[in-house]
């Protein structure tokens, strides 16, 4: 069994325990007794025992405080070597994700059987793609090792940071490595790990079918440049198309014509479906891509409403940056005014994202997804950044990074009733030449806003400070899921995105490299959150729920993306949005900000085992 299969099996089982998949944790017992007839050299090994009419599962587990209470492992710290299944008096050793999926299928409702079969294919794809991407990492080692601060242009720095980020797996979704729908050859041509340029295809669409949100950018081709008669411009509009998406279509709908020639050389970014225009690198174009990632239900097409909702948040956040002293100079937003769509069709749409040169030209833009990426010298990329921008003081960098995230996102939550889905891909840290960090924002089409608090805050600001008229109205939002009727939804998003994805994942990576203990790093995070809550409360803002969720509750909310995105039907999960399906099950690591507290917590879990 190869290393990648073991790696994926570990991630899969840990996620199943974290999300209590099919009751495998809540219906289990824990014991220190090994399966009958099995000799295990590790003393004090804890076994998760799950009884089912068809079998009994014995899974070796260890207690943890990070994202879940138990994970698949051995007490000696070495990688687990499998589990045991007792059937009809016979004990069988297993260790492959295929066997784990077979167990889950036995436990699952019939509505999940097809989903589990599909997920097995995703696992196999992830195993293959990981091997190919690991090869690409070795091949590009010299290129990605060059100091990012020494590159001549901001856009080369961003592309390099995206490429570095692409080699690191998602912290929590087990098969994020799979770009499901891409062949080996497709991966090499179109994935950021390989950093190859390609040309966009174009579709001429009858104007009567098309909606454009503004004028198309200067880099757009003419009809003649893509091999069509010039007078087509009177009746048609050109839409960009990814080669893979165009290839997947059996035929184009009526009113659409594929242009004979390609135009615009582009390079893929971390998201794969968003590409950089090589000759105009401040222009990024997001195009539909027939690819699934972060869940078999997550097809990377473009919902037309996101064009409008993303631009709505761009206008709002840019306005708040200008009018709120706590946000001023701490963030800037890409221009996402332009896009096009054909009715509600998700396959024929695009968004243009323009990076503002006044904010970018003197900076290095780094997605949060790149920070914990391992480099060829076995250090984390964040260590390289600290060396180049923070006089090698990694802890000083971490302090400033946490303070920046907490100040911006807690202000948005508690003052304005806004929570951004600023995941590791969307959250970008911009370093200036002196090392000062700001946040570059984009793609905020799936945020959450509580209109009651938002309206109160903006009206109060206008009365008190004479702030300019608010440029947006909540009634303009198209995706009604964005608007929430209580504060909990904001707290859940802050916890699962900003705190867990953007901060805790970085903490654990730093601790694994012995840069500092996780306890000391969580102490920095807890202190930063406390300072921001005290500041905001001192200004008269309500912090009760935030304190309950972050400073008092023993468990934090966690996102259950494997459940909602891949293994449970919508009827079973009840999730209206697969990216916002939560469980209250992650230990609150903010309360474990000393090594003594961590040890006591783990010992308490062990003592609960009979």
Language-model features: locations:
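Short amphipathic alpha-helical surface micro-motifs
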Residues: 266-270, 410-411, 420-423
């Amino acid at each position: 069994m190869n290393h990648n299969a073991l790696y994926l099996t570990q991630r899969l089982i840990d996620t199943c325990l974290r999300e209590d998949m099919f009751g495998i944790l809540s219906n289990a017992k824990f014991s220190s007794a090994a399966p009958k007839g099995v000799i295990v050299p590790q003393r004090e090994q804890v076994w998760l025992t799950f009884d089912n009419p068809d079998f009994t599962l014995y899974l070796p587990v260890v207690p943890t405080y990070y994202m879940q209470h138990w994970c698949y492992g051995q007490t000696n710290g070495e990688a687990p070597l499998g589990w045991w299944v007792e059937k009809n008096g016979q004990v069988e050793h297993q260790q492959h994700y295929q066997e784990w999926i077979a167990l889950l299928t036995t436990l699952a409702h019939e509505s999940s059987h097809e989903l589990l079969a599909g997920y097995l294919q995703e696992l196999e794809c992830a195993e293959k793609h990981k091997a190919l991407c690991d090869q690409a990492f070795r091949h590009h080692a010299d290129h990605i090792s060059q100091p990012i601060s020494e590159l001549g242009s901001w856009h080369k720095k961003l592309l390099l940071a995206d490429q570095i980020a692409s080699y690191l797996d998602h912290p929590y979704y087990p098969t994020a490595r799979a770009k499901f729908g891409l062949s080996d050859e497709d991966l090499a041509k179109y994935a950021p790990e390989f950093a190859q340029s390609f040309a966009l295809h174009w579709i001429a669409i009858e104007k009567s079918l098309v909606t454009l949100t503004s004028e198309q950018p200067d880099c757009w081709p003419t009809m003649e440049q893509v091999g069509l008669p010039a007078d087509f411009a009177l009746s048609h509009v050109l839409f960009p198309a990814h080669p893979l998406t165009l290839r997947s279509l059996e035929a184009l709908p009526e009113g659409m014509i594929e242009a004979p020639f390609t135009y615009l050389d582009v390079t893929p970014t971390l998201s794969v479906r968003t590409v950089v225009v090589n000759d105009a690198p401040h222009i990024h174009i997001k195009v539909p891509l027939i690819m699934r990632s972060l869940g078999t239900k997550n097809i990377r097409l473009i919902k037309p409403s996101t064009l409008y909702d993303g631009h709505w948040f761009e206008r709002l956040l840019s306005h708040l940056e200008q009018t709120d002293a706590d946000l001023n100079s701490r963030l800037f937003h890409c221009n996402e005014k332009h896009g096009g769509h054909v009715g509600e069709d998700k396959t024929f749409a695009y968004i243009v994202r323009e990076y503002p040169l006044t904010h970018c030209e003197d900076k290095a833009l780094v997605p949060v997804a790149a920070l914990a990426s391992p480099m060829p010298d076995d250090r984390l990329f964040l260590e390289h950044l600290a060396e180049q921008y923070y006089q090698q003081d990694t802890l000083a960098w971490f302090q400033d990074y946490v303070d920046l995230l907490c100040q911006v996102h807690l202000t948005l939550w508690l003052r304005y009733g806004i929570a951004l889905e600023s995941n590791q891909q969307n959250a970008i840290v911009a370093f200036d030449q002196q090392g000062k960090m700001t946040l570059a924002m984009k793609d905020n089409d799936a945020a959450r806003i509580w209109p009651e608090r938002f309206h109160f805050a903006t009206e109060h600001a206008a009365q008190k400070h004479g702030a300019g008229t608010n440029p947006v109205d909540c009634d303009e939002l198209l995706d009604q899921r964005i608007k929430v009727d209580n504060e909990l939804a904001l707290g859940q998003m802050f916890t699962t995105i900003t705190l867990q994805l953007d901060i805790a994942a970085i903490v654990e990576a730093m601790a694994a490299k012995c840069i500092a203990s996780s306890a000391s790093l969580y102490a920095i995070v807890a202190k930063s959150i406390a300072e921001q809550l005290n500041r905001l409360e001192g200004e008269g803002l309500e912090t009760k729920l935030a304190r309950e969720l972050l400073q008092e509750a023993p468990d934090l909310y966690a996102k259950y993306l494997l459940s909602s995105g891949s293994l449970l039907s919508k009827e079973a999960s009840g999730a209206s949005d697969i990216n916002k399906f939560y469980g209250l099950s992650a230990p609150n690591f903010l309360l474990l900000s000393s090594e003594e507290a961590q040890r006591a917590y783990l010992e308490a879990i062990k003592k609960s085992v009979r």
